Amino acid sequence: MKPVIALVGRPNVGKSTLFNRLTRSRDALVADLPGLTRDRHYGEGRVGARPYLVVDTGGFEPVAKDGILHEMARQTRQAVEEADVVVFIVDGRNGLAPQDKSIADYLRKTGRPIFLVVNKAEGMKYTAVATDFYELGLGDPRAISAAHGDGVTDMINEALEVAYADQPEEEDDNDPSRGIKIAIVGRPNVGKSTLVNALIGEDRVIAFDMPGTTRDSIYVDFERNGKKYTLIDTAGLRRSGKVFEAIEKFSVVKTLQSISDANVVILLLDAQQDISDQDAHIAGFVVEQGRALVIGVNKWDGLDEHARERAKADLTRKLKFLDFAKSHFISAAKKTGIGALMRSVDDAYAAAMAKLPTPKLTRALIEAVEFQQPRRRGPVRPKLRYAHQGGQNPPIIVIHGNALDAVTETYKRYLENRFRETFSLTGTPLRIEFRSSTNPYADKG
């Protein structure tokens, strides 16, 4: 699995700026999705052939006793304890603060690899920046400027050397004994363990535990209606006899790693609770990772008609950027709706892995343009000439033509909908890339 880098520090030291720089290659993929919060806490970065996950923990108040700061501190502690490397960020301009000492005291006790990073160090001599922070007892400080990028590449390379040293060998995704890899994600108490047992069935468990990382990610192979699946542990599910129980609280790190490792993600929601920012953040990460997705709204049997309409409206309003995914209203406890849910898992996987022939893609593109042409931008109208497939899981469609930088986001979404309809691409994100001719005088007007 991809290693996890946790960014920790008191408020306003530049964690979000560093987060954005470390994940910059992925920003464009989600920035234009309507309804998706921009306040992202999880992202992916890559240095060469080494991908990694980043968690921005928010402002860390390690001694907070109550309220929102207490909850943030609890979540931060859990992320730190499960991360492969912790990047502890301090402010080089303002110098050492009492809060930095409290955080350092806590971090030293965790046993995690700690990288002490002095941010906002642009234009300052290293000795002047670093001297204050040696007393934290976390080794040599690394001076960076997250805003300008100074020192960031060297820092993340060092962190990845440590993170990858502890990573087990990657599993073979082409292993024929493995089926579609499914991650079931969601907040605590939404019914993940109940759904797992409904899927696997107590009387016909074909399951075994395989240690993944040192923090015991578990893969459970099972069959359903003659098809093979592999369930990735997301909720600290552990087998008790023939059933699975959730014995750990919600883990951001395990959730991110499971999403990244999956072929299809089931986002499980509680019909009796409003959709939270946490749900939206996790859903956004699924889209960013390009994973096929099915939404399960659990405990549906406990709602009257009015409550059901309210829950559907909440889903449409808060997760409208997931309109490509099928939603199923289920009861894991009563095992209702499970069959339809799994059929959507199969369909989403098939869509994510679909092979799209160039002639058919180009024909679909031409028909879409004939039905609705892109708007002009000044004297220039984009000319869309042909399309081919650039990748799978998620499907990537590459469109060639002239002046394609003038294509609007609205028109891009129109094309996406046309391609989805033509090729039945339900349940998977779809990427569209434009490649323009290098001739600046081509096809003006």
Curated annotation (Swiss-Prot):
GO MF annotation terms: ATP hydrolysis activity; GTP binding; ribosome binding
InterPro entries referenced in this protein's UniProt entry, alphabetically: AAA+_ATPase (IPR003593), G_ENGA (IPR031166), GTP-bd (IPR006073), GTPase_Der (IPR016484), KH_dom-like (IPR032859), KH_dom-like_a/b (IPR015946), P-loop_NTPase (IPR027417), Small_GTP-bd (IPR005225)
Residues that bind GTP 1: 9-16, 56-60, 119-122
Domain of life, per lineage: Bacteria
TM regions (residue ranges): none
Domain KH-like: 354-438
Residues that coordinate or bind GTP 2: 186-193, 233-237, 298-301
Pfam families hit by this protein: KH_dom-like (PF14714), MMR_HSR1 (PF01926)
Entry keywords, A to Z: GTP-binding, Nucleotide-binding, Repeat, Ribosome biogenesis
Annotated EngA-type G domain residues: 3-167, 180-353
Single GO BP term: ribosome biogenesis
NCBIfam families tied to this protein: GTPase_EngA, small_GTP
Subunit structure: Associates with the 50S ribosomal subunit.
Function text: GTPase that plays an essential role in the late steps of ribosome biogenesis.
Family to which the UniProt record says this protein belongs: Belongs to the TRAFAC class TrmE-Era-EngA-EngB-Septin-like GTPase superfamily. EngA (Der) GTPase family.
Name under which the protein is recorded: GTPase Der
Protein's organism: Burkholderia multivorans (strain ATCC 17616 / 249)
Lineage: Bacteria, Pseudomonadati, Pseudomonadota, Betaproteobacteria, Burkholderiales
